[in-house]
Amino acid sequence: MNGDKQTCDVTNDEFFKHPKYLTVSSQLHLEAFVHEHQKVWTLSPTFRAEKSDTPRHVSEFWMLEAEIRTESLQEVMDLVEEMIRTLTMRLQDSGIKEELVYANRSGKSGNGESTHFSILLDQRWHGLTQSPWPRITYQDAIQKLQDAARSKQAIFQHEPSWSTGLQLEHEKYIAGTVGQGNPVFVTDYPRKTKPFYMLPSSFEAADDMAEHKTVACFDLLIPEVCEVVGGSLREHRVEDLTRSMRSHGLNALPSSEINAEPDANTSPSLETGNLDWYVDLRRYGSMPHGGFGLGFDRLLGYLAGIGNIKDVVPWPRHYGRCDC
């Protein structure tokens, strides 16, 4: 910045010596802390460059992330379910519903819309407090979608298949039919569609074909909003982690060098890029663990009956817009 003229000189000098980028998740850093503490969490700003201008997407949002020591994906899902249920029950015991209904009524004529909005909140909160929430594998979800398409029970714009993943219309169908108004966990997605750090599932598809390998992960689908939480068990074995990194196109160490001491004369960035420290967490000792990330603004919008996430965030920044 230049004196009182308030002009900026733009340079190409790298402030951190190398290009660095906005944070898309704090998960990897939480994994470092869980080595010392059994349960860790953070509520942090997160940035995504998704070119999606929908009521469900913004480029900057808050995400609640947690990591725990566990060998069980069920335990991670239990934690998510109990956390959201407890939060909702406390909302029911508070006076916040009346405030939301009053705020929704402001500027509107008649009580019809307010009554409808009040019923909407009751339905959503009731669904979140029911127990237990259904859990279904990705394979079973695809089968249900394909059966529905063949029997004409549902018409999808995107044909459901193992390789193409679950589209929004598929998630809405699963949430509506399997959950019937309650949240639904979908587990064990294809390995090829998920990040490198996820632990393989304890079982594989019946035909055991390579393209049908799965990882121990889940998405939590909430009616209307759909995916709100994603989580998994993390790969804690150094050889398997580096193998997964290579298969995902990351420059991991060759197997013969995994247990070798790092060469002081060699830059770690030549071996594992910016993830050398992450591999070291496994190389020098790790334990089974898992965690999740919850889209905080999406959940707030669902609880408050707000249909567009851009109305939840005070200064929404999204694809094509960053006004302030």
Predicted feature residues:
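A generic structural motif
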Residues: 65-76, 224-227
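Flexible loop/turn segments at secondary-structure boundaries
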Residues: 29-31, 48-53, 72, 192-196, ...
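Beta-sheet entry/capping signal
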Residues: 19-21, 38-40, 182-185, 219, ...
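Class II aminoacyl-tRNA synthetase-like tRNA-binding/catalytic domains
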Residues: 1-71, 272, 280-282, 301
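Metal-assisted phosphate- and nucleotidyl-transfer catalytic regions
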Residues: 1-10, 82-225, 247-287
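A residue-level signal for conserved active-site and pocket-lining positions in enzyme catalytic cores
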Residues: 22, 66, 141, 186, ...
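His/Asp/Glu-rich mid-to-C-terminal helical/loop segments that flank catalytic regions of hydrolases
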Residues: 35-37, 72-93
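Active-site pocket scaffolds in enzymes
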Residues: 232-324
